[in-house]
Amino acid sequence: MIKIIFLLLSFFYISNNVFAQPPGKERNIDWPCIQVYIEELSWGSIWTGPVLTENSAKWIDNKDIFSLAEKLMDRKTKEKEGTDELKKYIKKNKSSDKLTMLFHALFDTTNTIWKIRNEKLLNFGKRQRLTSEKIALKLEKIKELSKDFESNKDEIQKLENEKFWDIRRFEDRRNLSDSLCEQPRFYEKRLGTYAGIMLENTN
């Protein structure tokens, strides 16, 4: 039983150490995902069209582009619906400047979502780390109190009950981690799909 609990407590730390940050980057101990932690996206790894400039950054003042970017990056928008909307826009706005501005809007929108999702994942990971530390401390205390079980049985029972629920919470959250960790990648993939369509129509 102790071995099983030890493996459970080790899961959080093993995942962080095996899938460490690239050399030169400090690992965030609260990052709960096997995917490498990337603080923000780089447009150069997605977009090979015209360079994003102060001019393309003016998308924020363009109501049509602003609303289109929000709709295209909304998780509720199905990919086919999004690509159809994008192609309609391209038919009416084929200029390189317009498409670059739209990509800039999509990129900035995605990056904002990316940062928010990552912050939530870090908070999730911190809760897991703190819970695992609580369990380890209770195990240590139970071990110490068990040296005089009869005198400490009430306290031991109390700690055993708390430990049970701590482990239950830890496991319940761990079962959610894979789907939560995939959420930022969903938006990155969607952005890549849209970028590919726009690049086909960019001179």
What are these regions (language model features)?
Residues 20-96:
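N-terminal Sec/ER secretory leader and immediately downstream segment
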Residues 154-203:
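Alpha-helical oligomerization segments
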Residues 110, 117, 124, 128-146:
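Non-transmembrane amphipathic alpha-helical segments
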Residues 4-14:
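Sec-dependent N-terminal signal peptides
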Residues 75, 89-96, 109, 127, ...:
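Surface-exposed polar/charged interaction patches
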Residues 90-119:
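Short, charge-rich amphipathic alpha-helices with coiled-coil/heptad character
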Residues 137-165:
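Short E/K-rich amphipathic alpha-helical oligomerization segments
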